[in-house]
Amino acid sequence: MNKGGGSGGGSGGGSGPTAAAAAAALQKQKALLQRVETDITSVVDNFTQIVNVSRVSDPPVKNSQETYMMEMRASRMVQAADSLLKLVSELKQTAIFSGFASLNDHVEQRIEEFDQEAEKTNRLLARIADDASANLKELESHYYSSAQRLTLDI
């Protein structure tokens, strides 16, 4: 999972929603890995038992018991395989939805950064306008009080 941000905007803090989300993601990852381990172990154990039970023996009663055991083990293998398929589907959905969530978070972060840049730019433009206005007033006062202007008007 991609939890790293882009070029940061300077808002600090190592805790909060991001740390909580990372802890929740780690916990979910551990639970999913445990499910995978359990299901794979079940498939392997049941397959091993089917192979062990499938040896042909003489008494018909024992053969029917072994057949029942094989069917039971095969059923457990199918259940474990079904659980693995559901897990894969859940992982795909999680990847899709967490991808959208992290994308939305990134978009919101970028919007906030651009809003801050727009504010900074507006303040800079206002300061430049104030400076230009003050300089223009100063130039006008020098022009109207200068001796050269008086000689040009005569």
UniProtKB/Swiss-Prot annotation:
Keyword Transcription included in the entry's annotation: yes
Primary localization: nucleus
Location in or out of the cell: Nucleus
Transmembrane feature ranges: none
GO cellular component: mediator complex
Pfam hit, one: Med22
Keyword terms: Coiled coil, Nucleus, Transcription, Transcription regulation
Gene Ontology MF terms: transcription coregulator activity
Entries under PANTHER family matching the protein: MEDIATOR OF RNA POLYMERASE II TRANSCRIPTION SUBUNIT 22 (PTHR12434:SF6)
Subunit structure: Component of the Mediator complex.
Function summary: Component of the Mediator complex, a coactivator involved in the regulated transcription of nearly all RNA polymerase II-dependent genes. Mediator functions as a bridge to convey information from gene-specific regulatory proteins to the basal RNA polymerase II transcription machinery. The Mediator complex, having a compact conformation in its free form, is recruited to promoters by direct interactions with regulatory proteins and serves for the assembly of a functional preinitiation complex with RNA polymerase II and the general transcription factors.
Protein name: Mediator of RNA polymerase II transcription subunit 22b
Organism in which the protein naturally occurs: Arabidopsis thaliana
